[in-house]
Every structure is written in structure tokens, then in C-alpha cells.
């Protein structure tokens, strides 16, 4: 092995055993394969995907129990079998990497790679980063950037791709449906692109965060036929609809509503993923004669991962507007239940060094050394 710090034999980790069954356990520290690095986790962020994994007990492509889960993290390299990163380097890593050999990689669509390598295991004191991810999607973070900010890179990279896919332009009227963590990131990036952004969500506390991120109009209601008409009438030129609508909920109903709310010649990004087997019924006359362009955005690319880190490091995306508290590794099961009940902030930083029961504010996270 190239270089390393002192590493214990075992570590504390949150292990998924099945549906709604997460246990804090002492397990062996992961062994490294050639080209891997071992990272001491300073911060791992909660994620809607992790909540789904917790509720379902598995993820078809990424995780089968029993297994440590969590995939948004930043930390310090403590052992390296890779010349790019030495022990002591602080890094953020994405949760996947493409092969660059398949048909889609040759088309420069690495997010659609036939052999996309996924990695999990961030809800632990240490996490192994596989060699391919080290080579493609592992970045050094600035010395003054808190880990709880840097860990936002992976989801933000997905949002960067979503906004780039629909090429939002300055002065456009953009509607984001849903103000969950990714909806908020999509809204902020649309603001940075120069758009006038409207966000609709039925939870006022989420919309308060959207306003902090520069969203011009926030509407705290569930979408209905009456609200669709009012949104067009009040927030779009000539009452024709929005230039671009981004759906960030992941339901067939809101996918359809997104199509209804866009203007003729406009673009829709069906960003929110629906459960497998969900079917969509749309008015084909509307699509064809109004020339509606439909997009869907999945995952991230090495390019958008790097752009995401730049947005965070330069504070163009104020990470602690989203990451609003820090909790301990021991408290993760409780945090997941709070997320399930809709009582959690957009993002919670899970901090392995934090004592059980402690809770840090965003201001305290700024100074916390993981």
C-alpha cells in the first residue's frame, strides 16, 4: 500500500439489514483493492434515495442487505493504493464512475454507462472508494471548505446536469415543481442562470428555504386545476405558460401537470424519478402541435461533479442553506424516521465524531472539525 495513517481494525457503521432495519454495529474496516483509497468520513449527508432504501430495504442497482449504505460524503484519505491521493488529503467522491469503454461512454453519455460502478458505505467511520471512482470522480477539496458543505457535491452534480440539459437562459420564466433538496438545488441553479424562478410545494417551510436561495415566487399549495390556471395567469407572459418546467417530485400526476404548465415551444424536464412501472398518459395533440420538448435527466457526469464542487467552493450555492443540522452516526435511524415524517431539514450532516444525541446548527457546522 502506498501510504497510510494509523487505522483501527474495526469501525462503527450503520448497517442496513432490510426494510426499516438499520443497526449501528462494529464491523471490520474495509480492505483495499489495487487503486483504492480509504477515507475517514468527516460528514455524510442524508438523501431521499437513502430514505427510499431504508423504507424498501434495498436498492436494485446500488445496495443489497446486509450492507453499509449512504453515498454523499467528504473526508480525509487515511490509506491510499493510488498515486493521485496521499494520506492526509481531504476529498469528496461521487458515488459512481463510468467505464469509458461502452457504447454510451463513446457517445459522451457517461451517466448512461452500461457498466456504471456504484459505491455506498458512507454512514460509517471509514469508507472505501473503489479505484475507478478514485480515477474519475474523486476531487481534492479546499482546506477551508467544511466537509458538510463539500458532501453536497454528488446531489448538486445531478441538479447541474438537469439544468444544463434544458439549457435555461437569462430572463426565462422557470417553474420548479417540488421543493425537496433536489428541487431546491434545481431552483438555485436556475436562479444562477438568470431565470425568474417560481417554485410550488405544499410545505411552507421548504418554500422559505427556496426564498433564501433567490426564488422570486413561492406558492404553498398542492397543484390543482385551479392552481395550474392561476400559475399561468399570474407568473407567465401572455398567460401562455412557463418557458421551462422542471418536475422534481417523481409522480405521474405532477409529470402531467408539468406538461400542462409549459408554454408552446417550451421545455419540460421530468427530473423526479417515479417508481418502476409508472405509466404516463399525455395529450399527444398538446405535445405535437405545441412543439413541447420533453427531457429527462438521470444522475451526473464527471464534468458536472467538478462544476458542482466549484459552485459550492465559491458559495454560489450556499450549502448550509440546505444542510441545516449535524447529527451523530448513532442517531441516523432516528433521523431517517424524522425524514419519513416530513420533520427533517432539507439535508442533515451525519458526523461520525459527534457524540450521540448532539445536534449542531448550520452555524456550528461551519466551525465543526470532523
Give each language-model segment a name.
Residues 90, 145-223:
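Mid-domain Rossmann-like dinucleotide-binding core that forms the NAD(H)/NADP(H) cofactor-binding site
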Residues 166, 213-292, 356-360, 364-369:
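Glycine-rich cofactor phosphate-binding loops and adjacent beta1-alpha1 units
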Amino acid at each position: 500500500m502506498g501510504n497510510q495513517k494509523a487505522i483501527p481494525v474495526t469501525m462503527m457503521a450503520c448497517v442496513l439489514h432490510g426494510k426499516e432495519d438499520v443497526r449501528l454495529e462494529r464491523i471490520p474496516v474495509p480492505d483495499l483493492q489495487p487503486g483504492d483509497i480509504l477515507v475517514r468520513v468527516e460528514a455524510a449527508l442524508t438523501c431521499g434515495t437513502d430514505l427510499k432504501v431504508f423504507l424498501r430495504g434495498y436498492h436494485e442497482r446500488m445496495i443489497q442487505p446486509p450492507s453499509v449504505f449512504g453515498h454523499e460524503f467528504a473526508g480525509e484519505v487515511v490509506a491510499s493504493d493510488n498515486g493521485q491521493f496521499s494520506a492526509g488529503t481531504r476529498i469528496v467522491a461521487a458515488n459512481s464512475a463510468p467505464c469509458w469503454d461502452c457504447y454510451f461512454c463513446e457517445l459522451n453519455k457517461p451517466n448512461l454507462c452500461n457498466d456504471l460502478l456504484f459505491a455506498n458505505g458512507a454512514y460509517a467511520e471509514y469508507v472505501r472508494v473503489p479505484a475507478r471512482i478514485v480515477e474519475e470522480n474523486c476531487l481534492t477539496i479546499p482546506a477551508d471548505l467544511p466537509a458538510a458543505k463539500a458532501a453536497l457535491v454528488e446531489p448538486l452534480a445531478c441538479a447541474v446536469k438537469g439544468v444544463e440539459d434544458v439549457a435555461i437562459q437569462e430572463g426565462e420564466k422557470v417553474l420548479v415543481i417540488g421543493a425537496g433538496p433536489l428541487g431546491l438545488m434545481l431552483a438555485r441553479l436556475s436562479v444562477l442562470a438568470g431565470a425568474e424562478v417560481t417554485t410550488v410545494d405544499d410545505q411552507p417551510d421548504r418554500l422559505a428555504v427556496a426564498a433564501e436561495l433567490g426564488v422570486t415566487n413561492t406558492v404553498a399549495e398542492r397543484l390543482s386545476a385551479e392552481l395550474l390556471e392561476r400559475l399561468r395567469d399570474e407568473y407567465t407572459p401572455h398567460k401562455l405558460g412557463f418557458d421551462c418546467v422542471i418536475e422534481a417530485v417523481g409522480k405521474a400526476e405532477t409529470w402531467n401537470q408539468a406538461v400542462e404548465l409549459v408554454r408552446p415551444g417550451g421545455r419540460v424536464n421530468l427530473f423526479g424519478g417515479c417508481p418502476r412501472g409508472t405509466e404516463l398518459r399525455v395529450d399527444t395533440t398538446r405535445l405535437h402541435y405545441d412543439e413541447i420538448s420533453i427531457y429527462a435527466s438521470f444522475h451526473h457526469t464527471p464534468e458536472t461533479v467538478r462544476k458542482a464542487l466549484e459552485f459550492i467552493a465559491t458559495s454560489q450555492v450556499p450549502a448550509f442553506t440546505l444542510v441545516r443540522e449535524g447529527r451523530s452516526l448513532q442517531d441516523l435511524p432516528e433521523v431517517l424516521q424524522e425524514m419519513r415524517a416530513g420533520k427533517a431539514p432539507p439535508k442533515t450532516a451525519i458526523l461520525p465524531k459527534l457524540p450521540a444525541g448532539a445536534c449542531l446548527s448550520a452555524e456550528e457546522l461551519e466551525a465543526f472539525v470532523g
